[in-house]
């Protein structure tokens, strides 16, 4: 399981990064979600790695 936490604001992100955060369900700063560890989730995290904090 992977825990993803939004630590930086979505303001100033490009539309693709915003859609990725929406797909991850992260809307507010300090919001956390837990996901299964798979390639799809890892790819989404890679697109917004500068905005999130990942814990395994």
Swiss-Prot record:
Keywords (A to Z) from UniProt: Ribonucleoprotein, Ribosomal protein
GO terms under biological process: translation
Transmembrane segments: none
Keyword Glycoprotein: no
GO molecular function, one term: structural constituent of ribosome
GO CC annotations, alphabetized: large ribosomal subunit
Signal peptide start-end: none
Entries under Pfam families matching the protein: Ribosomal_L30 (PF00327)
Keyword Ribonucleoprotein annotated: yes
Family: Belongs to the universal ribosomal protein uL30 family.
Self-association state and partner proteins as the record states: Part of the 50S ribosomal subunit.
Protein name (database record): Large ribosomal subunit protein uL30
Organism for this UniProt entry: Oleidesulfovibrio alaskensis (strain ATCC BAA-1058 / DSM 17464 / G20)
Lineage, broadest ranks: Bacteria, Pseudomonadati, Thermodesulfobacteriota, Desulfovibrionia, Desulfovibrionales
Gene that this sequence comes from: rpmD
């Amino acid at each position: 399981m992977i825990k993803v936490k939004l630590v930086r604001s979505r303001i100033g992100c490009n539309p693709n990064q915003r859609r990725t955060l929406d797909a991850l369900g992260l809307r507010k700063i300090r919001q956390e979600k837990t996901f299964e560890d798979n390639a799809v989730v890892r790819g989404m995290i890679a697109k917004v790695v500068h905005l999130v904090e990942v814990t395994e």
